[in-house]
Every structure is written in C-alpha cells, then in structure tokens.
Amino acid sequence: MTDAAAVIERVRQRVDPTPAERRALAAAASRLTERAEAAIAELPVAADVVQVGSTARGTWVAGDRDIDLFVRFPSDLPREQLETYGTTVGAAVLPDGHEEYAEHPYVTGTFEGYAVDLVPCYDVAAATEIKSAVDRTPFHTTYLQEHLDDGLAADVRLCKQFLKGIGVYGSDLRTQGFSGYLCELLVVEYGGFEAMLAAIEDWQPPVVIDPAAHQQASFDDPLVVVDPTDPERNVAAVVSAANVATVQHHARRFRATPSEDAFTPASPAPLDAAALRSHIDRRDTTPLAVVLDAPDVVADQLYPQLYRSRDGVVRGLREHGFDVVRAAAWADERAVVFVELASAELPAVERHVGPPVSVGTHAERFYETYADDDGVYGPFVDDDGRYVVERDRDVRTAGGFARTELGTVALGARIESRVASGDYDVYVGDAVVEALLPEFESELAAYVDPKA
Amino acid sequence: MTDAAAVIERVRQRVDPTPAERRALAAAASRLTERAEAAIAELPVAADVVQVGSTARGTWVAGDRDIDLFVRFPSDLPREQLETYGTTVGAAVLPDGHEEYAEHPYVTGTFEGYAVDLVPCYDVAAATEIKSAVDRTPFHTTYLQEHLDDGLAADVRLCKQFLKGIGVYGSDLRTQGFSGYLCELLVVEYGGFEAMLAAIEDWQPPVVIDPAAHQQASFDDPLVVVDPTDPERNVAAVVSAANVATVQHHARRFRATPSEDAFTPASPAPLDAAALRSHIDRRDTTPLAVVLDAPDVVADQLYPQLYRSRDGVVRGLREHGFDVVRAAAWADERAVVFVELASAELPAVERHVGPPVSVGTHAERFYETYADDDGVYGPFVDDDGRYVVERDRDVRTAGGFARTELGTVALGARIESRVASGDYDVYVGDAVVEALLPEFESELAAYVDPKA
C-alpha cells in the first residue's frame, strides 16, 4: 500500500458513514417523505417529494445529519399558492419547525436528530427553465445519481474532507470555496479523488471544465465548471483565485508527501496580547483597526460588504501614499477592517504631478493654480516634462485617514451607513491589541501565522 | 509698442554689440587671420583660415569675447601631420597660448583681450564626409551666413539671452540645453524670435524640424532639429525633455506676460543652515547625501556620471522599498547625490511575492525555499493565487543602503570606483546640513525653491 493509499484509508474510516448511520438516515428520510406525501394528498393540487442534497446522493461525510426534501409543484401554479402549499406541507412534516426565507419561504426544523429543510419548488421540464434557483436542485440530484457509483460517492466524501481540512469547503461568500455539488462534479469528471488531485496539480487557471460539453456562456472566473444541467451557469463562480491556488498547493503537497493533516482543519491556538505585541514588534509595522458593531445581516451579505470595505480602505490608504503590508477583515459581534502599515505617518509634502507642459490650456491651468501659492514647492518641471508641485498632504496619518476619509472610499453598504453616522472606532498601533483581543484571537492567530 | 516689444527693445540694448565692439572684434579677427596665413605660408602644404562661431556670424551677445579660427588642411593629409601643422600655426598665432585636446589637439590663448581658439581641421567637400567632428563647423558657418540677415542675427542674440535667462542655454552635458547653433537654426526656421516663441508654445514633443528637408535617420529625442549640413545628425540631441518643457513654459509665460525677468538668470540667495533645517522640518522628510571628492574629469564626463549615479541610487532605494520624494546631484570640490526620503526607515519585514501556484516546478521551488524557514511569515497564497512570504529585509535604513548596497546599483564609472574602494561618506537627516553647507548653498537654495 502506498503512503497515499494508507493515509486515504485512514481518512475513509473517519468520513464513511457506518451501515447503521446509513440505515437510520434512510429510515428517517423515508418517514419524512411519507409525512410529506400525506400532507400533499390533502392539497387541491398534485405534487411529489424528492430527497436532494448529499444525503440523497450518498456523498455525505459521516456525522452530517442534514436531510433536504423538495416538494415539486406544477410549474403553472401561481407563486403565492406554491408558497402557501409549501408552508402547509412543511408545517405538517415539521410541526416544531419554523419558516425561513430564501427566494421564497421554506420550513426548517429537526426530526429524530436530523436537521431537515422542506423546500417547495416548481417541477420544470429542464434546469434551463427554472423559475427559482431551488428548482434546479432536483436536476443536480438526478444528474449525479446517474453518474455516481458507490466508489465515486466515497471519493466525494474524501474530497469534501480534504477541502474542509485546507479551509476552502463551502460556497458561502465568506469562504468563497467549493460547494458539495462542485466536489461531486470534480470527482466524477476526473474519475476519483486521487485522479482529481493529479489533475488539479496541473491546472493552469483559468480552468474550464464542461462535463456535459454544452457550455453556452463565457465566464470570467479562475475556475469554470459548467453546470451539466444548465449550460449558462458556472458551478464554481464563487471560488476565488486564492482558493483555486490553495487547492492546487495542497494537491501538490499531498501527492509529494501524503499526510492526514490535509484532511484536518487547522485550529491555531488563540493569540494573547503578549504574543500579538511580540509579532508587531518583530515586524516593526503599525497596525490600524477600523471597528464597528457587525451589521445585522446574514453572513452571505456581511462578508462581501466587509471584504469590499477592506479593499476600499486599502486602496484609499495607498492612494494617500501609505504603504500597506497586509490587510484582513473579520466579523464576530463586531466587524473589523485590520490593516498593517509600513508606517502610520507620511511626510508633510506630497508630490503632485500635473500635465505635460505641452498640453496647452490644461497645463496652463495647472500652473496658474499653484504659481502664486506660497504653500507649495514649485510648480517645476520634472524629467518627463510635466509640471509638478510638492504640496501639503491633506492626510498625514493612517489614523487621520480612517477618522476623516472613510467616506471617500468604496465600502459595503451597511458599513458605509455606519461610517456615515460616525458609528465606528479607529485604533492605531498598540491600542489595536486591547481593542481586538480576545474577540478576534483566532483570526489574529491565523494572521500572524499565514499558511497556504 | 506692445509690452513684448518694449521688453524686447530693452533686452536688445543689453545684448546687441555696439558698433565699436563689432569693429574691434573684426579688426582683431582680421589680424589673427593674417598671422595664421603667414604661418601657413611657411608650411609645405596648402591650407586656408576660416573664422567660425557666433562672432563670425554676428550672433554673439554683447560682451562675449570669443574668436574661433579654423585652419583647413587638405583632406588627404595624414592625421599626425595635421596635428603637427595645426600646433605650429597655433603657436605662431598665439605665442602665449597652450594646447588642449578634443578629438585632436588645438591651441587656445588670448589676443588683445579676446579668448581665441585656433583649431586645425580637414577641408572636406561636404559635412557628411567629415573625418572629425570639428570639420563640420565651417559648414555650419557657411549655411548660416547664407540664411541669416542682420535682423535674424539680432533675434538670435535675443534667443540666446532668453535661454540663458531661463537656464537652458548650453549643449554641455550638465545643462543638456540648447547650443548657439541650435538657437540660430530655430530663429531662422521660424523667421524671428517672437515667431519662434509662438511656435514653441504649440510644440507637441517629439518635435521634428528639418530645415533642409533631408532627414535620413530617425531620432528618439524629444526635440529633433536635423542638421542642414548633415541629414543624419540631430542638432538638439542633448536637449532633455525637461528643458524642452522649460522652454515651452517660458515661451508661454512671456507671451502671456512679457517681462525682462525671462532674460535674466535667477540667482537665488545662498541657503544657510537655519533655512535648510527649516525646510526639512516643514517638509518632514529625511535627507540622505552620498558625498565624495569630485572625480578629476571634465564636466562633460563628470555630469553624465553624476546623473547616472543619482538615478541608480534612486532606483536602488525604490527597489528596496524606500519612498523617494525628490533627488538631485551636484558637483563642486566634492560631488554629491542628494536624496530626500519620505522615511529613512522601513519595517522589519518585506512582502516577497513569488510565482503563481500554478506554475509547477518554479512554484514548488519557491515554496520549498521558505516552507521550513521559521524566519519568514508564510509561504501563503495571495488574492491573485501567488505564493507570498514576508521575510526580513536586508536593508532597513536608507543610510544602511547607502553604506552597503551602492555597489549593486548603476553608477557612473569614476563614481563606481570611488564607491568600490569605500572612498565616500554617507549623511542622513540633520547631519546632511553641516555636510553640504556652505559648499552647495546655491544648489540647495535652488532645490528648496524649485521653479519651472
């Protein structure tokens, strides 16, 4: 047995559900389906029940206890009735459940220890004719049931555990990683987990995979996996370039040096104040933190806004002449944009380059603007023949930037409104330590020990 | 009379030689020519004497007292004999003169208060057949005598005084400005001084002027004036882009607001230590000076080496992460590369971006280099999917850079050898003040009051 095979065998023992687990889940799903069918029989409309998701496909990782049931209504049913009937069936199946809302309401609850979602959808003829995103899901299950066998399903479990271990599993907008469906398609595409790793090692982004050979749209993403049920959809649309690279890195590492580590999420020891101070001293940088109460929105809204804000703050600082070493954004009770700067203070003057002297009116206007201004050095002519002045900076400190200029940078909507009302705090240098610990002790631990 | 005409009239009174000055100069030139012809008569070879330069063309500025005589020998005369005969004639004409050496020796001395150069050259059929650069000069004089009249010659004097006033007169490699011959061609081309200013105001570099409409080479210069005596030569080759822009700036200023100031070189009051410190405080920058004894070479060798060294030091500092606000290079007894920095100190770590993870062997090698190095942060993967480490900087201070890294940057040859032997000093911050004053008090005065 190769090293890789031995490692994989040990991982299989962790991720493969036991026969008892399978039987229990199948029995629970069956009882739920019967309940749903009984409720449907009471309705003045025909509908059927399909089990979807990883537990329908046999690709769930041992210990996962999610059952997803979709109730398919005729596609000509008005939306309000679909919602009403769906809620009615949901309440009958999960009397202790509650409604949640995606594109339309669905019912979520627990049943015999399983987390159950009961989702109404339209029974359309093809995934390309869907009326709502959830209508597509049954087609995914059908496609995979046709293409997966027990061996591939087991390899999907390995793949999921691998991606969890390296921190890129999940198509939520915080992770920007790989969905379960994407794992399934990749394992099917390459014919197994190890073959998939071998293929990933050679990826040259942008990578395009089209299992059904029917791509009809072009995608500007580092990884494109055309949905076999919809030629215009990239299943990997949310996967970031960094996560594509991370998978590639770990595929290469695992193949060179197989280890169970890749299948185990890192959990760095939380960082205490002394350790954080020691890193800041060692790096001799200046940290800046913009801190606010986390906006009360779901994670898939919060994180894109937070990342956009981080990028906006970094861009703004750079445009003002600050040298950013690294930046991050985190959320817990509070949300934080954390920026590490080479220096938190700039000279009093900045070089302001104007137009080439040769551009006539425009150049003349620049010259006239500054010619009689005793507060600037110049205008003079640079080596390229452009007018230049050295003028006083508006903003000389990173803290000053964060306190007065955040309104000028691109921020996420809910963060922008907080900033507009001054409802945020700015910390610079050592003050950052007390401000962020212990709330962000895990995030800071990862920050000071960054890994591929 | 327009404002411009009134200003120009006053300048003419300063720059036009008086009839007495003209007569005296013509008489002196005539006597020198007779002496030279007498000496030639003693030689076993035929030759003639031509007066060249601005005093031959009537374009000299009042007070200039230069007479240039060229002795033209047959083009088949061996070079050693040309040199011997030239020196013989020179010694006869200027018994108190001494030899200098350009492409070949010539004699320079004084005669009745005039500075006289007596230069041997070959009498070739056309400027394109020259054997040495000086052979071209008589053709320039012939061309201009055909194209200049008294009015244009007077406007050439205005042009020269204007370019002197704004600091761009002289084709030496320190100034990188306009030669007298170039002034003459421009005034002829545009038909007068004011017409020239009007044309310059509209220049869109690169500007190409070809008086004889015979250009045969292409030139990568911001200003091209094809020599009417040589289709492959750009008379304006040494003029820098900055000087083209400077002329354009002042042409525009003069036409908008005529003033005699443009015809008067600026002479800023020398800067004392208190004033320099006050500027440094006000700008809140850190000055750095690399100082050495000026290499003992002529200015046309020294300044290109000095400018190259300045550019090399600036590039090196930037490559090491320093933010350079402005830089300069000056020479007197000592030579100095002066650099003004936003900050003289950088963080302990620097971001070192490696290859994209996807590039296989190259990426793997980068990862392996740092994977087990406890001294770095990372390797991790950046947003673009590249490996990154944050590693300790080799050089954290600008002074350290100047003391240990100058050998790694492009320097002028004679400065490079000084640096190689450690024969230079580095000053940072306030120490620069005492180190550079009073020797560079004028240069520093101009530096802290930069003008177009």
From Swiss-Prot, chains A, B:
Describe the reaction catalysed, as an equation.
a tRNA precursor + 2 CTP + ATP = a tRNA with a 3' CCA end + 3 diphosphate; a tRNA with a 3' CCA end + 2 CTP + ATP = a tRNA with a 3' CCACCA end + 3 diphosphate
The EC number(s) given in the record are 2.7.7.72
Binding of ATP, residues:
54, 57, 140, 160, 169
**So where does Mg(2+) get bound?**
66, 68, 117
State the source organism's domain of life: Archaea
Q: Which PANTHER family match?
A: CCA-ADDING ENZYME
UniProt name for this protein: CCA-adding enzyme
